[in-house]
Amino acid sequence: VFNPHPVDIKTNEQKGTFPSRRAAVAADNCSDMIFKNITFKTDCKGQAEGFLLNGERNYAENVHVIGDGDALQVNGSAYWLNCVVDGGGDTVLGRGPSYFNHCTLSSYGAFMWIRNTKENHGNIFNDCTFKGLGQDAVIARLPDNKGKNYPDAECVLLNCTLDGVPVEGFGPVAETASTANLLEFNSHDKEGMTIDISRRNKHVRQLDAIKDAETIGKYSNASWVLNW
């Protein structure tokens, strides 16, 4: 599904407008759609989406997305179940909100560059697996971007498996994004052993099963995250 737009509009600059010319598959301003049992793939390198999705209340199940930078870009609410995303870096990009349930992601660089505003949640991962394929495969990064950042960005990991992810987990996170909501609960390695969080990025907050039970419960609820 393709919706052309002015060439002077940059990615994520305005809601509903982004350059879909580089994506293998682009669903632009599409809502209430279901994507099941399908693979979206591009062989292009650089900023090359396998799948670019813009819209509200979209659902994906057993979808395999293969790209390079920005392999999966999502702008608008979407639920992902048993999906696989393979990318080169900033593998999941966009404004969200996205709820990932039992998904597997692999990346050579950072898994995410989160860009949601305070208007909605960001990227939430429940029982997902992250496979880092390179030394820079942090979960998410928030560097200054040409004088701009995303202070309301949100990334939450619940009961996730981390394999090949650097000990700092997240980063770099510039001070201009120090208010980002980066939460982690019960991350473990592929053997099920608790991850060493002693050297985690200072901007990441670890959730406690008892003290933060209410917060964990909310983020475990996809309807609450997506406002569906």
Mark where each language-model region is.
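Sequence-level preference for short, compositionally simple segments enriched
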Residues: V1-W228
